[in-house]
Amino acid sequence: MQDQYSRTQLLLGAEAMEKLHHARVAVFGIGGVGGYTVEALARSGMGALDLIDDDKVCLTNLNRQIIATRSTVGQYKVDVAEQRIHDIDPNIKVTTHRCFFGPETQDDFDFTQYDYVVDAIDTVTGKLALVMKCKEAGTPIICSMGAGNKMDPTRFEVTDIYKTSVCPLAKVMRTECRKRKIKHLKVVYSKEPAMTPIEDDSISCKNHCICPPGTQRKCTVRRAVPGSNAFVPSVAGLIIGGEVIKDLVGFVPLKG
């Protein structure tokens, strides 16, 4: 009997779909990258999703974030994502966490309960804390490197952190992972050199912040706000979603 996952089952098979229906994945960061990862996971039949983010949808998110529309501005991202997931499949178990993940909140999570973890957060401190907790728990993790200030979505690659190049964030992560004796870390990164954002005082976040009331991390306190678009972070997020799904079901690609 056909259902909403029939077309996916034609590629993966019934046994793989059953694995996905019983899997629980945590996505840390529901923004330009993480939002599309959540979309891919929900549309692929994931049984349970944990969404972690403390931010609210801002008008400036509409250029790239799948959860951002005029009607969702000012709402918590995890709440909007939960509603969207349940519009796709009401049977998916969704757990939302309105928190900023970092060393201060890392012990609030039991990483042994997750079958896979996605890092789509934008601070090195948070990324490293997340990686360390996953390594301690033996939980698979995939990390997103820099997706801002880029224009070519075809330059993304999936590889180990120690095989990355070009990306400044990946360089920092390589150094910090070595210090922590992390032997392997699966990442999605771009070989495209980052552009320098055009300076334009009329749209400066520091001078014209429009973050919704109650936003915990306003753009006025950020060191730099990267330029972004609809077609680069989204691709990174979908690549990550695909990697999670393939890893969970043990997908073996055809040779040739």
Predicted regions and their residues:
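Glycine-rich phosphate-binding loop and adjoining beta1-alpha1-beta2 segment
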Residues: M46, L51-D89
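N-terminal charged helix/coil linker that caps or initiates catalytic domains
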Residues: M1-A26
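Conserved N-terminal Rossmann-fold NAD(P)-binding element of oxidoreductases
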Residues: V27-G29, I52
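Conserved S-adenosyl-L-methionine
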Residues: A42-A48, E136
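Hydrophobic/small residue at the entry helix of a nucleotide-binding pocket
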Residues: V33-G34
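Conserved SAM/SAH-binding loop
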Residues: R98-Q106
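Glycine-rich phosphate/adenylate-binding loop
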Residues: Q2, F109-Q113, G126, E136, ...
